[in-house]
């Protein structure tokens, strides 16, 4: 299906776009959909542009602003598709020029537009009126020797590419910023342009930045290798709470003292246990992790301490237990409170004497193992209730370490998000744009009762539900969570007005609008928005086509359904 531009086809109503803007002054935030926005003086942007040009030169500055605009265009194309699902896909493209204007970037006057998504055809010509970048140059920086609308040009290329699903390139053929009468642009597929290698080079990361990043990456990798070799790997985090954990581990790691890790479920106790092992002199020896709650009570002794042949039915071969396999290294017993009384007694002997006997055997075996245990329950209460041996508790509780929950490590969430997204992108063979700003804010404010494990699961769900090159939204992470934010919004006249759940209804009543007039207005607006297509307008209002046609005929009895078209 193709679309050739005609003036009457331009989608004039942008209420669906402007309604996405929220000014939440109480929080100091402005939102466009799920992306956080800023209002900034043009003179500030002019100073920024001047500094960038003086710092890296005109050519590199041009590439920088083109890439900046390109990223913004990608996000706005995603927003346009979400807000206009009932319209023909080609007509959704017109949301791009409206978002240009809504952001104060430029007014767009489309001259020609011929789009065929299935055929990969894209030809657009337009005039840009009052570009903010032209104003910057004409009033602050002076005229230049080439077109200056770099950010807007990058935006158009990013928006067009995301919309078409293929590489679209816009070029500015004339520009008021270099003395021309008008700002004119032409957009075509990369193939139609021919050799555009010199222009496409602007969209590649700057070599200086790449080289610096590559060096930083190499240094970081070397540091990580040194840390792992020296046993200083702790996982992910830089919050004060996490740094305190690392300092505590440092003090205990080099000895052989028993460490008891305390904390809620999902806080990363096994990661901390591995950190203790890697930091110790036993780093080159085995690290064996056991979840005591996952082993049936009647098998826990044989699993931990081994079994001799014939000890019980089915024991046809002798088998070493986890303690013997960890000899010389470290064993980590998670959910240690789940040990049976007999297993607790055997564990106490191992700690006191450094020896054990396999189940069904009579031979004493020496073991040299460092013990790290963990629980999310209160062991002292378990001792009082008779569930856990007091003498064993005192042996385990020599060096207790409390691991804080994720809600007390909010600063670590962005790092953890980046880590888990990288992992799941690789696992599912896709690359999203990461979390939307609102989704990240939701993560920072959520209490995370399941801690890091719950965060990882939520991010995995987000990656699964989100298409490549789209942002992960709040709904994908937290199904059913309300995302609406009360605040001030833009009215149709461009003024800020307070909005809450029922403010729109109050406004209708205050203006004396009748139910009949309201229905008629909804019908007309839906039809205008959908290019007089009854089926699309019906979907927009949640009606069937016959119901929509009936209401339209009721609104205008002289109108025949056949004359109304589709």
Swiss-Prot record:
GO terms for molecular function: ATP binding; ATP hydrolysis activity; sequence-specific DNA binding. Gene3D superfamilies: 1.10.8.60, Homeodomain-like, P-loop containing nucleotide triphosphate hydrolases, Trafficking protein particle complex subunit 3. Residues 235-464 form the Sigma-54 factor interaction domain. GO terms for biological process: catabolic process; phosphorelay signal transduction system; regulation of DNA-templated transcription. The keyword ATP-binding applies. Transmembrane segments: none annotated. This is Transcriptional regulatory protein XylR. Keywords: Activator, Aromatic hydrocarbons catabolism, ATP-binding, DNA-binding, Nucleotide-binding, Plasmid, Transcription, Transcription regulation, Two-component regulatory system. CDD domains: AAA. Disulfide bonds: none annotated. ATP binds at residues 263-270, 326-335. PROSITE patterns: SIGMA54_INTERACT_1 (PS00675), SIGMA54_INTERACT_2 (PS00676), SIGMA54_INTERACT_3 (PS00688), SIGMA54_INTERACT_4 (PS50045). InterPro entries: AAA+_ATPase (IPR003593), Homeodomain-like_sf (IPR009057), HTH_Fis (IPR002197), NO_sig/Golgi_transp_ligand-bd (IPR024096), P-loop_NTPase (IPR027417), Sigma_54_int (IPR002078), Sigma_54_int_dom_ATP-bd_1 (IPR025662), Sigma_54_int_dom_ATP-bd_2 (IPR025943). The gene is xylR. Regulatory protein of the TOL plasmid xyl operons. In the presence of m-xylene or m-methylbenzyl alcohol XylR activates both the xylCMABN operon and the regulatory gene xylS; xylS itself activates the xylXYZLTEGFJQKIH operon. XylR interacts with sigma-54. PANTHER family: PTS-DEPENDENT DIHYDROXYACETONE KINASE OPERON REGULATORY PROTEIN-RELATED, TRANSCRIPTIONAL REGULATORY PROTEIN. The keyword Magnesium does not apply. Residues 534-553 bind DNA.
């Amino acid at each position: 299906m193709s679309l050739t531009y005609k003036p009457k086809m331009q989608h004039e109503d942008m209420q669906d776009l402007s309604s996405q803007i929220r000014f939440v002054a109480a929080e100091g935030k402005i939102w466009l959909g799920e992306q956080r926005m800023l209002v900034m003086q043009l003179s500030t942007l002019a100073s920024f542009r001047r500094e960038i040009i003086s710092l890296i030169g005109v050519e590199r500055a041009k590439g920088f602003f083109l890439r900046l605009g390109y990223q913004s265009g990608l996000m706005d194309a995603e927003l346009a598709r979400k807000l206009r699902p009932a319209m023909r896909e080609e007509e959704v493209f017109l949301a791009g020029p409206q978002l240009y204007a809504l952001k104060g970037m430029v007014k767009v006057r489309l001259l020609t537009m011929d789009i065929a998504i299935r055929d990969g055809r894209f030809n657009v010509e337009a005039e840009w009126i009052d570009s903010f970048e032209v104003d910057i140059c004409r009033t602050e920086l002076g005229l230049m020797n080439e077109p200056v609308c770099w950010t807007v040009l990058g935006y158009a290329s990013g928006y067009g590419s995301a919309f078409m699903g293929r590489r679209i390139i816009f070029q500015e053929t004339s520009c008021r910023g270099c003395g021309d009468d008008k700002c004119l642009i032409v957009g075509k597929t990369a193939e139609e342009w021919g050799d555009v290698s010199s222009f496409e080079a602007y969209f590649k990361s700057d070599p200086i930045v790449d080289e610096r990043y590559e060096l930083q990456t190499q240094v970081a990798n070397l540091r990580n290798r040194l840390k792992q070799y020296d046993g200083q790997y702790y996982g992910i985090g830089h919050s004060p709470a996490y740094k305190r954990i690392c300092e505590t581990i440092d003090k205990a790691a080099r000895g052989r003292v028993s460490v008891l890790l305390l904390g809620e479920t999902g806080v990363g106790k096994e990661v901390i246990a591995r950190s203790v092992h890697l930091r110790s002199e036993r780093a080159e020896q085995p690290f064996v992790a056991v979840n005591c709650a996952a082993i049936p009570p009647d098998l826990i002794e044989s699993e931990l301490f081994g079994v001799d042949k014939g000890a019980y039915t089915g024991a046809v071969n002798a088998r070493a237990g986890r303690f013997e396999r960890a000899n010389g290294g470290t064993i980590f017993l998670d959910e240690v409170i789940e040990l049976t009384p007999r297993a607790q007694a055997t564990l106490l002997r191992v700690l006191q004497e450094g020896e054990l006997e396999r189940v069904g055997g009579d031979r004493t075996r020496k073991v040299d193992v460092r013990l790290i245990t963990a629980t999310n329950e209160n062991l002292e209460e378990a001792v009082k209730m008779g569930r856990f041996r007091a003498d064993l508790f005192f042996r385990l509780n020599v060096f207790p370490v409390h691991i804080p929950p994720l809600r007390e490590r909010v600063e670590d969430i962005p790092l953890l998000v980046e880590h888990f997204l990288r992992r799941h992108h690789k696992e599912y063979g896709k690359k999203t744009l990461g979390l939307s700003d609102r989704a990240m804010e939701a993560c920072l404010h959520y209490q995370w009762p399941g801690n890091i494990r719950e965060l990882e699961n939520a991010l995995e769900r987000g990656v699964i539900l989100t298409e490549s090159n789209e942002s992960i939204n709040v709904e994908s992470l937290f199904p059913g969570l309300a995302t609406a934010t009360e605040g001030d919004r833009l009215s149709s006249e461009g003024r800020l007005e307070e909005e809450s759940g029922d403010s729109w209804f109050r406004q209708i009543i205050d203006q004396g609008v009748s139910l009949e007039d309201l229905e008629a207005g909804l019908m007309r607006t839906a039809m205008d928005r959908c290019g007089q297509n009854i089926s699309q307008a019906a979907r927009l209002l949640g009606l069937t086509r016959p119901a929509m046609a009936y209401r339209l005929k009721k609104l205008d009895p002289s109108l025949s359904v056949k004359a109304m078209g589709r």
